């Protein structure tokens, strides 16, 4: 029995060395193909738009270092080009009291010559920032509505120019549809 156990441990050790020695290949393969994940990082709740021949992406940022904006020519190779904000100025954000809070499920849009980013925070509400260039600078965060527990904002502008905001509530709550002012600052 002891021999079997030692042999088993030896095989496990040998196999773990084999697995550790193999390179993990992900992203662009250089031959017109790719292997997921294309981004080897935590980019949850992505939202992507195409403007001209470029793609722009934003994702949830559960920490407080600022939401990155990424750019791509092919939706495989991404680079960080700016940050929407540098830090939150809300109480408790600077001492990790709200770890996991941050900005949730952002939406990026291009409308009327401007980039618009909306996201919710767990307690402070629905936030918005704009820029004429995705590389920045981004306007200071504006609280569109203080709705704690809001999630998944989805702004859109109708053909007649009327702006709307669709959103959910924490825990897959009901879906809300709000009229929004044309400047995107008020529901």
Label the model's feature ranges.
Residues 1-22:
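Bacterial Sec-dependent N-terminal signal peptides
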Residues 21-187:
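Carbohydrate-active catalytic/glycan-binding domains of CAZyme proteins
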């Amino acid at each position: 029995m002891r021999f079997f156990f030692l042999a088993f441990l030896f095989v496990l050790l040998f196999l773990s060395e084999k697995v550790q020695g193999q390179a993990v290949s992900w992203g662009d393969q250089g031959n017109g193909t790719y292997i997921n994940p294309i981004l080897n990082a935590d980019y949850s709740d992505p939202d992507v738009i195409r403007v001209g021949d470029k793609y722009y992406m934003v994702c949830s940022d559960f920490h407080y270092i600022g939401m990155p904006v990424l750019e791509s020519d092919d939706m495989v190779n991404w680079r960080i080009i700016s940050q929407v904000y540098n830090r939150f100025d809300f109480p408790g954000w600077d001492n990790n009291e709200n770890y996991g809070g941050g900005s949730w499920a952002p939406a990026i849009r291009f409308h009327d010559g401007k980039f618009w980013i909306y996201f919710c925070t767990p307690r402070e509400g629905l936030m918005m920032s704009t820029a004429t260039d995705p590389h920045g600078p981004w306007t200071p965060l504006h609280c569109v509505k203080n709705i704690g527990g809001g999630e998944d904002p989805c702004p859109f502008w109708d053909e007649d120019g009327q702006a709307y905001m669709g959103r959910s509530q924490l825990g897959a709550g009901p879906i809300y549809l709000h009229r929004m002012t044309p400047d995107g600052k008020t529901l």
